[in-house]
C-alpha cells in the first residue's frame, strides 16, 4: 500500500472511530485504534518497498523510482525491507550511469541480512561489475571470493566465471 491509500484508510477509520465512540461501541474502538496503529506502523517500517519490488520485477523503473521516493527515511525501514530498498536504488543508479551512487547503495545492501544466498550473491556480483568498470581488480576478486562462498544459481556462477575471466585478462 502506498502512503495515499494508507491515509485514506486512516481517515475512514477515524470516521468509524468517531461513530463507534458516539454510539458507545467501545469494543469496536479498540479494533479501529489497532487498525490505525498498524497503518501508521506499516508506513513507518514497511514503506512502499513491496510495491516497488513488484514494479522492479516488471522492469518498470520509473514507477519503482517514484515508489522508493515516497520513503522519507530509509533508516527506519525494517532490515528485510531496507536490503531490497538499497538493492533497487543501486540498480536504478546503475541504469542511470551513476556508478559511485550505485556502489554506495550496493555496499549498504551487502551489509544487511538476506534470507537467501543467491539474493546476496546478486549484490556482490553487481559490486564486482562496478569495480570491474573502475578497473579496481583487487576489489573485484574480493567480491568474487565472497560470492563464491554463497550458494548461487547456475546463472550466477556463470556470471562469476565471466567476471573472473575478464579480471584475469586485464591483470
Which sequence ranges carry the predicted segments?
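Short coil/turn linker motifs that delimit alpha-helical repeat modules in TPR/alpha-solenoid proteins
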Residues: 40, 77-81, 115-118, 153-155
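Alpha-helical segment of the N-proximal tetratricopeptide repeat
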Residues: 45-77
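"A position-specific structural signal for the A-helix of alpha-solenoid helical repeats
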Residues: 50, 81-88, 119-126, 159-166
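TPR-repeat structural position
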Residues: 61-62, 99, 137
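Amphipathic alpha-helical segments of tetratricopeptide repeats
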Residues: 69-73, 107-113, 145-151
